[in-house]
Each structure stands twice: as structure tokens, then as C-alpha cells.
């Protein structure tokens, strides 16, 4: 396929670096979830998804949330993003109320960017056009600035050679990396990742894990990460929040005392296996409760 060459720009590279470098404001991003309750349905036919859920997501750290399927993890993520309302309680970002009394649904905004399970790249746009799209549409960057910043960020992520490709022409793993790069183009305070690597094979997933940690080490953005993969949770997270079966609330919070930067050699260490065993035991206990509750509901 013959493609028209993309425009090139002559802006000094120092200015491009200034566009890419994280700002002082962007380095914040503490989320505080306080006594959050979410009930779906009516009083006569309701589902109690989240109940008195309280925990913090520290700024500039990776917090991974695990728990039985259907326990309410994604409900919390959607409330933070502004996609769903809460019933009561409050959620704060850097001590500013996102949702709570008088405003039960947060306003979506570029300070909180979601990377979905199934991806959301525009198939008719090239990689650089996808990456540059957000800041251009919001009017925060001109087309020239957005393309310059996008190229610099793709280069940092090892994706420089893909900018003229379309999403359907690259692997699923590469598309995931492009989506995260596109999210970071908006200079968010928080990345909200909902099982982003669920559909990947184990080898590709391991490469994506290390790529995400490299991205985190460069940007220090707060990451709220949902997964069912417990090994993934321990490898990536500074903290792992283990949720109860529905209604969702923290059962246990682990601080993963394994220094960053991490690589896959940590998976064979005794400390890693101890964290994993503790997590498996807690999640398994809740999964049994979820199964028993499902049997009773039949």
C-alpha cells in the first residue's frame, strides 16, 4: 500500500523534550476511596456490588487490584474514570472530590485515562495519528506539536518504526504499547488499566510487563491496574489490593517490598514466591465464597 508521507517538523529537539517530560503537577495522582457503596438496580431487585470500600492509591506508584470474577473491581475503576456513579461514599483525586455527596458521578477528564481490555485504536488512522489524536481534539496541542510529541514518545517506547502503520498491521502486543503511549500523550495523573494484557499469550505478556515497567520508570505516573493474573499483580505492583467476593471491599493489602526497576529474574526469588503464595491463598478463599454464593442463588 502506497501512503503519502507524513509531515515532518523542524521544531528544536529541546522543545520536544519539554513536551514529553512529566510536569510537577502530573507527578501527583493520589486516589482516595472512602466508604464507597455501589448498588445496582432497584430496592426490590438490587445487586450490592461495592460495600464500604476504603483504600488509597498512592501517587506515583502501581496499585494492582485482584479478586474473584464479578466482585466489583471494574465497578470501582469505572467510578474513578467517571463512567459510573456511586451510591454513597466519596472518591478523591489529590484531595479534590471526584464523586461523593452532591455529585455521585465523576466528570471524565484527561487527568484519568483508561486503557481498556479490548483496545480502542482507530483502525483507519495510522499509529502516529492515533497517538496525536487526543491532545489535538482537546485543543491542548496544535497538530504540529502533537505529531512532534507523539514521535518522541513512540521513540521512547521503542515504536519509532511503526508510526506510518495502521493498527491492523501490527501485533496485538504492539497495539497495547501504542494504546499506553497514546494514553500518556494526555499527561494524565492516573492511568486506569482494566486487564490490558488478558488476551495476550504468556510470552508476549511477559514482554509487555517489562515494557510497562520501563514506561513507568520514565513517567512515574500513578497506575491503577486490574487483573486476574496473580503473578502479574506481584511482578508489577508496589501494592496489591485483594478484594472480597461481592460486595467488594479490601480483604488484604500487600506492600510488595521488591525494589524497582524489576525484571523477570525476581520471579524466581524466595520473596516473590512468598508474596504470591499469600495472594493465592487470600484470593482462593474469596473464590470459594463466590462459588458457594453462586450455588445458593440457583
Named regions from a protein language model:
Residues 100, 143-162, 214:
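Conserved ABC ATPase "signature" region
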Residues 128-137, 147, 151, 255:
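Short helical segment in ABC ATPase nucleotide-binding domains corresponding to the A-loop/adjacent helical element
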Residues 64, 114, 178-183, 187:
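ABC ATPase nucleotide-binding domain "signature" region
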Residues 81:
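Helix-to-loop junction immediately C-terminal to a conserved catalytic motif
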Residues 165-168, 186:
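Conserved signature/switch motifs of ABC ATPase nucleotide-binding domains
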Residues 66-68:
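The feature captures the beta-strand-to-loop junction immediately N-terminal to the Walker
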Residues 42-44, 98-116, 137, 143-147, ...:
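ABC ATPase NBD coupling module
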Residues 89-100:
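Conserved ABC transporter NBD signature motif
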Amino acid at each position: 500500500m502506497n501512503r503519502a508521507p507524513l509531515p515532518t517538523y523542524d521544531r528544536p529537539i529541546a522543545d520536544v523534550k519539554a513536551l514529553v517530560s512529566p510536569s510537577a503537577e502530573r507527578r501527583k495522582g493520589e486516589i482516595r476511596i472512602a466508604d464507597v457503596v455501589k448498588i445496582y438496580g432497584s430496592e426490590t431487585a438490587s445487586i450490592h456490588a461495592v460495600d464500604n470500600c476504603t483504600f488509597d492509591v498512592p501517587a506515583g506508584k502501581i496499585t494492582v487490584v485482584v479478586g474473584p470474577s464479578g466482585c466489583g473491581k471494574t465497578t470501582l475503576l469505572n467510578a474513578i474514570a467517571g463512567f459510573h456513579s456511586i451510591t454513597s461514599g466519596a472518591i478523591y483525586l489529590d484531595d479534590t472530590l471526584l464523586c461523593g455527596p452532591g455529585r455521585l458521578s465523576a466528570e471524565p477528564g484527561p487527568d484519568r485515562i483508561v486503557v481498556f481490555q479490548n483496545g480502542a485504536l482507530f483502525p483507519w488512522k495510522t499509529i502516529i495519528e492515533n497517538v496525536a489524536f487526543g491532545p489535538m481534539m482537546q485543543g491542548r496541542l496544535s497538530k504540529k506539536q502533537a505529531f512532534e510529541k507523539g514521535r518522541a514518545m513512540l521513540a521512547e517506547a521503542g515504536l519509532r518504526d511503526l508510526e506510518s502503520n495502521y493498527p491492523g498491521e501490527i501485533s496485538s502486543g504492539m497495539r497495547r504499547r501504542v494504546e499506553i503511549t497514546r494514553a500518556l500523550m494526555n499527561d494524565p495523573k492516573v492511568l486506569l488499566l482494566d486487564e490490558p494484557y488478558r488476551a495476550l499469550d504468556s510470552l508476549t505478556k511477559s514482554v509487555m510487563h517489562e515494557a510497562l515497567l520501563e514506561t513507568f520508570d520514565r513517567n512515574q505516573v500513578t497506575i491503577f491496574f486490574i487483573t486476574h493474573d496473580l503473578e502479574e499483580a506481584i511482578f508489577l505492583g508496589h501494592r496489591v489490593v485483594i478484594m472480597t467476593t461481592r460486595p467488594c471491599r479490601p480483604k488484604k493489602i500487600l506492600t510488595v517490598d521488591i525494589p524497582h526497576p524489576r525484571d523477570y529474574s525476581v520471579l524466581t526469588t524466595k520473596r516473590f514466591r512468598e508474596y504470591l503464595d499469600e495472594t493465592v491463598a487470600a484470593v482462593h478463599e474469596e473464590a470459594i465464597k463466590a462459588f458457594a454464593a453462586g450455588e445458593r442463588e440457583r
